[in-house]
Amino acid sequence: MTDSSRTTDEAAIRERLDAKVAATRATDARAATSSFAPDVLSFDVVDPLRHSGVDAVKKRAETWFATFRGPIVFELRDLHISVGDGVAFTHSLNHASGDLLAGGKLDMWWRETLCLEKRQGRWVIAHAHDSVPFNPETGKPSLSLKP
């Protein structure tokens, strides 16, 4: 892989992730999942242990978006992209905040690793792994951590 193609691929991946961020802010589940492969496997921070397929990931996004009153503040911080021949991975710290329909406000950070494959000339997310650290003394998630 040449430096030029690596730079081009990294820019294409960054563009797809920027679109995912914009769609999440707009609570548009269809657009937010348009970068996912049809056979994506997602390990989310909430039940169940995995979501298999883009339809399951889209349904999860719709369910999450429906908990907000208005737009979601959403960002990726410390995004790192590593590109190889036909495969790539990213990792970032993700932040979401917004007013909840049930009352109160969500304001949390979590870790995300994405595995991408280049299929038919297009980068798609084949695997997503999101996680929240936990306190080993209490067994509870550490939701108040900030970078």
Language model: regions and residue ranges:
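A beta-strand edge to alpha-helix "cap/lid" segment located at domain peripheries
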Residues: 2-34, 41-147
